[in-house]
């Protein structure tokens, strides 16, 4: 047990401090913006301090553990803890949310509610990544959905209500399977429910029952990741949402699905995962090709970036399915890498839309001339997304490749086929990303803009872009910075595996 409740403070602070937004004086939106940014910055500094001084990298066990009895009736506990798997996503959440609040500066309509919802979402996401009790994990998972639904339905494009309804139907449907899985695991094999994660990890289940649990959890996480064919909510949602919400969706929300797959499906149900991993590998390879091909046919800029996210999630799925140290480390690195790159691309797409009021690529052209800074940053992030050497995306995808090649679970021929199909996916990625940049920025097409004067990005937007670009370059040059966090935990997870 940790003496000082670091994690409780980190989880509760955003939503608690955010509730005071409604009592701030009515002096315009400036006070609300600065208050929210200060809370996010304080939270990020607290998280960084706690992890720097109280987290040991060489310890694969759960650290900073807090365990308090909450509801005596069925032994429900407030149990939080951090290990090598969750420390990266928690820091990513803090970083991206802080920049998303800065990106939300132009939001003026109902700005109190908007900023409160962003902070409530922050608490739910940190809580999901640090929960060590299955029911608490489910509660935090659901807590995060409500703010997202409201952010989607109240701020965004003309079809925002349709996309928000589609989002909530998909995710609520997935949550039913998650709740059934949590209760099934908790109630199995004892008179008293045991929702403690450590107890559940050491529990052995009959193979048939473990497969049922696995499928239930998998559906819940497949909606969030998203995995084909449960991905159709994502392009609609990204196409209509405000770009600060898109940053949180692409940067953090999708990563919760990947985290759940590793944390519950891999760690809790290793035998079932060993059985299903070849199917995950097949779905992952199909997803890379399908989403990349579909992205190429999208006219809408934000939908094209959304499909590129779906394609990149295929690499995470393949890394998880490889059941090797290398592959799983590559998947975790891809989670962090795409968190930065996806958030940045949506931010830059949104700032471009704010200026030219166009979202369809065939209506754009020549944007590089009036907006050279946005052009430079957009091109840089497009190149990092297509895995240019020296960028974080390249390292993550190469490590996933090595994970498949070194996997002992698969025969040589399937490994060759999967690697070949993944390579085709990597060839398709520059085709749709570079054609997007060409349609948007090059040429001399005169587009009809309400204001004849289009200004380039200001200091705030440059700060957000550069703040995301630095870790992308940093991880690309020195990936051990992220890999050192997870390598011991990955070995611990894979020590439970036997090959069937």
UniProtKB/Swiss-Prot annotation:
InterPro entries: NADH_Q_OxRdtase_chain4 (IPR022997), NADH_Q_OxRdtase_chainM/4 (IPR010227), NADH_UbQ_OxRdtase (IPR003918), ND/Mrp_TM (IPR001750). GO terms for biological process: ATP synthesis coupled electron transport; electron transport coupled proton transport. GO terms for cellular component: chloroplast thylakoid membrane. GO terms for molecular function: NADH dehydrogenase (ubiquinone) activity; ubiquinone binding. Keywords: Chloroplast, Membrane, NAD, NADP, Plastid, Plastoquinone, Quinone, Thylakoid, Translocase, Transmembrane, Transmembrane helix. Belongs to the complex I subunit 4 family. It is a multi-pass membrane protein. Its EC number is 7.1.1.-. This is NAD(P)H-quinone oxidoreductase chain 4, chloroplastic. The gene is ndhD. It catalyses: a plastoquinone + NADH + (n+1) H(+)(in) = a plastoquinol + NAD(+) + n H(+)(out); a plastoquinone + NADPH + (n+1) H(+)(in) = a plastoquinol + NADP(+) + n H(+)(out). Its main location: plastid. It is found in: Plastid, Chloroplast thylakoid membrane. NCBIfam families: NDH_I_M. The chain crosses the membrane at residues 4-24, 35-55, 87-107, 113-130, 134-154, 167-187, 207-227, 242-262, 272-292, 305-325, 330-350, 386-406, 416-436, 462-482.
């Amino acid at each position: 047990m940790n003496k000082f409740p670091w994690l409780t403070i980190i989880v509760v602070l955003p939503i608690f401090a955010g509730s005071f937004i409604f009592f701030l004086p009515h002096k315009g939106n400036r006070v609300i913006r600065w208050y929210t940014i200060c809370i996010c910055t304080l939270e990020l500094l607290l998280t960084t301090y706690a992890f720097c001084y109280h987290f040991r990298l060489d310890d694969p066990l759960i650290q900073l553990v807090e365990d308090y009895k909450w509801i005596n009736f069925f032994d429900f506990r407030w149990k939080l803890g951090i290990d090598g798997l969750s420390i990266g996503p928690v820091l990513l959440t803090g970083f991206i949310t802080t920049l998303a609040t800065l990106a939300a500066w132009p939001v003026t309509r109902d700005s109190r509610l908007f900023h409160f919802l962003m902070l409530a979402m922050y608490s739910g996401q940190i809580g999901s990544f640090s929960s060590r009790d299955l029911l608490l994990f489910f509660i935090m998972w659901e807590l995060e959905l409500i703010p997202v639904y409201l952010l989607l339905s109240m701020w965004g494009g003309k079809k925002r209500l349709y996309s928000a309804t589609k989002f909530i139907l998909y995710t609520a449907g997935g949550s039913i399977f998650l709740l059934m899985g949590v209760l099934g695991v908790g109630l199995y094999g004892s008179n008293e429910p045991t929702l403690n994660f450590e107890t559940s990890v050491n529990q052995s289940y009959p193979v048939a029952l473990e497969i049922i649990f696995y499928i239930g959890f998998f559906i819940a996480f497949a909606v969030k990741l998203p995995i084909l064919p449960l991905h159709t909510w994502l392009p609609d949602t990204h196409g209509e949402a405000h770009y600060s919400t898109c940053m949180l969706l692409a940067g953090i929300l999708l990563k919760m699905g990947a985290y759940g797959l590793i944390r519950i499906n891999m760690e809790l149900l290793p035998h079932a995962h060993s059985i299903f991993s070849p199917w995950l590998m097949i779905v992952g390879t199909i997803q890379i090709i399908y989403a990349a091909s579909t992205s190429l046919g999208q006219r809408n800029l934000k939908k094209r970036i959304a499909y590129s996210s779906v394609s990149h999630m295929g690499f995470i799925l393949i890394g998880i399915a490889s059941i090797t140290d290398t592959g799983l480390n590559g998947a975790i690195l891809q989670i962090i890498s795409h968190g930065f790159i996806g958030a940045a691309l949506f931010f830059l797409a949104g700032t471009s839309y704010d200026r030219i009021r166009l979202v369809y690529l065939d209506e754009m052209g020549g944007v590089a001339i009036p907006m050279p800074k946005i052009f430079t940053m957009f091109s840089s992030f497009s190149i990092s997304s297509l895995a240019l050497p020296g960028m974080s995306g390249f390292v993550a995808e190469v490590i996933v490749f090595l994970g498949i090649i070194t996997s002992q679970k698969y025969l040589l021929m399937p490994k060759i086929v999967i690697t070949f199909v993944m390579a085709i996916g990597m060839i398709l990625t520059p085709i749709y990303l570079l054609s997007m940049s060409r349609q948007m920025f090059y040429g001399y097409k005169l587009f009809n803009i309400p204001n004849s004067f289009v200004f380039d990005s200001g200091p705030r937007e440059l700060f957000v872009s550069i703040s995301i670009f630095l870790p992308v370059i940093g991880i690309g040059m020195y990936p051990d910075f992220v890999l050192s966090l997870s390598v011991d935990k990955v070995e611990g997870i894979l020590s439970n595996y036997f090959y069937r």
